[in-house]
Amino acid sequence: MWASFMWHGALSPGRRAHSALAQLRCILDSELEGIRGAGTWKSERVITSRQGPSIRVDGISGGILNFCANNYLGLSSHPAVIQAGLQTLEEFGAGLSSTRFICGTQSIHKNLEAKIAHFHQREDAILYPSCFDANAGLFEALLTPEDAVLSDELNHASIIDGIRLCKAHKYRYRHLDMADLEAKLKEAQKHRLRLVATDGAFSMDGDIAPLQDICRLAAQYGALVFVDECHATGFLGPTGRGTDELLGVMDQVTIINSTLGKALGGASGGYTTGPEPLVSLLRQRSRPYLFSNSLPPAVVGCASKALDLLMESNAIIQSMAAKTRRFRSKMEAAGFTVSGADHPICPVMLGDARLSSQMADDMLKKGIFVIGFSYPVVPKGKARIRVQISAVHSEEDIDRCVEAFVEVGRLHGALP
């Protein structure tokens, strides 16, 4: 009797798997419904053209002005960059089918690493598939339980995740608060190495880290300085070296991580640049480097040409800066609050998640592509539409964007 009960009552492996899958679907459906209900659902628009100031979007007739790309210098569709990618593809193939330390290193990879190090005036550089990987691979390889890392509370998610992976003692200081950083540095004096980690420019707020003060405190308390320059490389500073050049502390920042996927052609890839022994250690221990395929040759060729163009002239940097000032001044004159410093990331602060999402949708109806950001990407109550200016936007593009903001803002009560 008992055996019969067990036979008929127990679920077969197939039925147990089906039951577990059904439970998972129920949990996921509930999570997704919660996101929709909160008004924070993120939809992916499908672009059917090249990246640029004017794009085509699936389902929408006519050209759309793009104000939400990281294409700060407009190099993602630059003819010379595209041609360099094609030539490298033809000469070196589609990919390496290998990691760097096996048979995935070509001369072009070493040449690009040398060019990056020269550009940043550092000893050496190492390429990664993305800057997310560079951040994920740095802290775990460098820091031990004897060490400490001190991180700005609004650092990019990739920095936060990278720090979580390491075994160092972790301190978080209030955003841009140098008094709090100093207090944390005092607490961390007992540790072997102390590394202050910060974004150079913060991607959601458009504000710039006070690197002069950070470097001063680091020197005072015997700490190293790490800066993520993803939203600075190529266009901040007189020659586009980044926030350390902008603020005159290039010789005081120890480690820089940045990307090839934004201003420098926009294709893909990231890197770490700094002291030669550090880069050598990363080649031996950094897991994203050791266990990821090499950057495709075409991506390497595009990035290398983008750096060449940047080092030939800073005219494109000046153009982007002038257009950024134009947008910010006109938006503020219209009554909007635009966060951050004179950075091409221009967050139009709205506060309410639904409002930012609805206004972004209505901006698209007027031919302007922008994105609303809300929790959990930004803190609750800090929803905004992030506008990003490119050197290849015309003054007419800027003015048309501002006019659309004014019309949509009045429609939704964001302006009187």
UniProtKB/Swiss-Prot annotation:
Residues 1-18 form a transit peptide. It comes from the Eukaryota. Its main location: mitochondrion. Pathway: Amino-acid degradation; L-threonine degradation via oxydo-reductase pathway; glycine from L-threonine: step 2/2. One of its GO terms (biological process) is biosynthetic process. The modification N6-(pyridoxal phosphate)lysine is found at K262. CDD domains: KBL_like. It catalyses: glycine + acetyl-CoA = (2S)-2-amino-3-oxobutanoate + CoA. The modification N6-acetyllysine is found at K42, K184, K380. SUPFAM superfamilies: PLP-dependent transferases. It is found in: Mitochondrion; Nucleus. Its EC number is 2.3.1.29. The modification N6-succinyllysine is found at K42, K184, K323, K365, K380. Pyridoxal 5'-phosphate binds at C131, F132, S203, T259, L260, G261, K262, S292, N293. InterPro entries: 2am3keto_CoA_ligase (IPR011282), Aminotrans_II_pyridoxalP_BS (IPR001917), Aminotransferase_I/II_large (IPR004839), AON_synthase_class-II (IPR050087), PyrdxlP-dep_Trfase (IPR015424), PyrdxlP-dep_Trfase_major (IPR015421), PyrdxlP-dep_Trfase_small (IPR015422). One of its GO terms (cellular component) is nuclear speck. Disruption phenotype: No visible phenotype. GO terms for molecular function: glycine C-acetyltransferase activity; pyridoxal phosphate binding. Keywords: Acetylation, Acyltransferase, Mitochondrion, Nucleus, Pyridoxal phosphate, Transferase, Transit peptide. Disulfide bonds: none annotated. HAMAP family: 2am3keto_CoA_ligase. Pyridoxal phosphate (PLP) dependent enzyme, which catalyzes the cleavage of 2-amino-3-oxobutanoate to glycine and acetyl-CoA. Catalyzes the second reaction step on the main metabolic degradation pathway for L-threonine. Belongs to the class-II pyridoxal-phosphate-dependent aminotransferase family. This is 2-amino-3-ketobutyrate coenzyme A ligase, mitochondrial. The lineage of its organism: Eukaryota, Metazoa, Chordata, Craniata, Vertebrata. The gene is Gcat.
